[in-house]
Amino acid sequence: MMKKDRILIISPHPDDETLGMGGTIAKLINSGTEIFILTVSGHLPPLYKQEDYEITIEEARNAYKVLGVSNFDFLEIPATMISDLPVHEINSKISKVVVDFLPDQVFIPFPDRHIDHRVIFDSAMVATRPVKESSKINLVACYETLSETH
């Protein structure tokens, strides 16, 4: 029996992965691929109300259910404030998921004009370097999310 691929999708915000590659996610799930979605930030205080975050997380969970994704996590960093954290902290959080999940492939956001997308792109590139813990990764690819910042 062939080993199933394990794919990690890193999303700066809830919905970026679905807007950027929802069809691909559904196709991969239907083919038996194991998918893990890591969402780094969300609509959290101080810029948003806590209720806004709860709504977007529930929407993300519903989208994952439709797509067939059962493995996911939310890091709960406030949106547009990712760049306020020390780079090593973000790198470490993403690296931990890479080491724990041990993906074969990783999909990351294209580094467009949105600062959160650029920071997550950079941190994901650090986390997926070919070192011992992540050496089984055979592909790192970008997905694009059209947004108001394009």
Positions of PLM-derived features:
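Metal-dependent de-N-acetylase/amidase catalytic core
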Residues: M1-I10, K27, S31, E51-E54, ...
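ATP-dependent adenylation/pyrophosphate-handling site
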Residues: D5-E51
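Short beta-strand segments at enzyme active-site cores
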Residues: L38, D73-F74
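Short beta-to-alpha linker loops that shape the active-site pocket of alpha/beta-hydrolase fold enzymes
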Residues: S41-H43, P78, L146
